[in-house]
Amino acid sequence: MTDRARLRLHDTAAGVVRDFVPLRPGHVSIYLCGATVQGLPHIGHVRSGVAFDILRRWLLARGYDVAFIRNVTDIEDKILAKAAAAGRPWWEWAATHERAFTAAYDALDVLPPSAEPRATGHITQMIEMIERLIQAGHAYTGGGDVYFDVLSYPEYGQLSGHKIDDVHQGEGVAAGKRDQRDFTLWKGEKPGEPSWPTPWGRGRPGWHLECSAMARSYLGPEFDIHCGGMDLVFPHHENEIAQSRAAGDGFARYWLHNGWVTMGGEKMSKSLGNVLSMPAMLQRVRPAELRYYLGSAHYRSMLEFSETAMQDAVKAYVGLEDFLHRVRTRVGAVCPGDPTPRFAEALDDDLSVPIALAEIHHVRAEGNRALDAGDHDGALRSASAIRAMMGILGCDPLDQRWESRDETSAALAAVDVLVQAELQNREKAREQRNWALADEIRGRLKRAGIEVTDTADGPQWSLLGGDTK
């Protein structure tokens, strides 16, 4: 599919849905704020990955070349605090949870990014950016830290709508700040924390600086689309815009933000104790069913989790799967065809997935009628269109990845029951300070090809070189 009819996307900065026109014809550059790898992923984290994976797949289906960058924040206050509380090196804590996020994305067949830069790998670029800001009069040093001077950038607040007098960065009071509305670009060295040398002394980067530097490194001073969760609009994305444009970069031309997964009307978060971890969810539903559910709402809408909604999504997915299996059994091989015009119109209208799904189920109903009437050609046309459309949404039931994973998921579920029993025995041994027995259980599991990692969320197991549970 190469017809590039008008694609319209909601730009947070403009506050409206507007025509998407890339910087370079035929090419799209996208930066997605990825995970801060402080803990295990839950379905709220992964929804963002699914939402913008659909955007990427749709652009690819329309014939664009897509450069898709998703970063990893592997140095940040919460990572340091949680690693210290667990008595583990910060870098090991970050790497462990980065692997868990990668496994979660892979489980839902989120396409790998074109590049996945880590913040710690781009310290040089961050220092260079600070130097440009200081030279331009937009940043200053104070108390070992470096701050961005918010009042030096008159356009501050254009993305979020915040008025300058109402700005609160949430960083607390700092002696080196000239104005409490300013935000930190570089944090001076503290005992026990990692640090890097700079012209202003040793220290580590501020969160906002990291993304600006990495986006520029991979996509250049100006690129097409910046994505992320709606909770990042302020202060994170507002500060990214300010520092990047103050440094002379055009930065992102479109800003897309996805809604949260909520429970009881509250954003899913560990602090509220209402999270549903990816390993737990994948014990209850198949990966393709979970992906279907997370992608089923409009990306800008809140997705209120409930068991009823989850089961409705499973039922809808199984209905499509059953239809495709019936056609394959009675008619023959089903190859992906082309999406219908109504499906394309829906996705061209700011990725209106609910309307696109309604079209898919309409085509399924037509296909079932054709199959029941003995119209094999009509049934095959419907099935081919459904495969194409579900493929763009990332959950084509006949894709070999999903069919093989169904068998793998069932096997992992059976193994998990056995491993969890062993882990419970190990936890009891540790509570009784029977370290020899605890080590024996861990060694027994390792000899069976199962690695155990102790985290703040409890012990997690993974197949050596494979899936995490």
Swiss-Prot record:
Reported cofactor(s): Zn(2+)
Main location: cytoplasm
Residues reported to bind ATP: K270
Compartment(s) of residence: Cytoplasm
Catalytic reactions of this protein: tRNA(Cys) + L-cysteine + ATP = L-cysteinyl-tRNA(Cys) + AMP + diphosphate
Alphabetically ordered keywords of this record: Aminoacyl-tRNA synthetase, ATP-binding, Cytoplasm, Ligase, Metal-binding, Nucleotide-binding, Protein biosynthesis, Zinc
Residues binding Zn(2+): C33, C211, H236, E240
Any one cellular-component term (Gene Ontology): cytosol
Family indicated by similarity: Belongs to the class-I aminoacyl-tRNA synthetase family.
Protein name stated in the entry: Cysteine--tRNA ligase
Source species: Mycobacterium tuberculosis (strain ATCC 25618 / H37Rv)
Classification of source organism: Bacteria, Bacillati, Actinomycetota, Actinomycetes, Mycobacteriales
Name of encoding gene: cysS
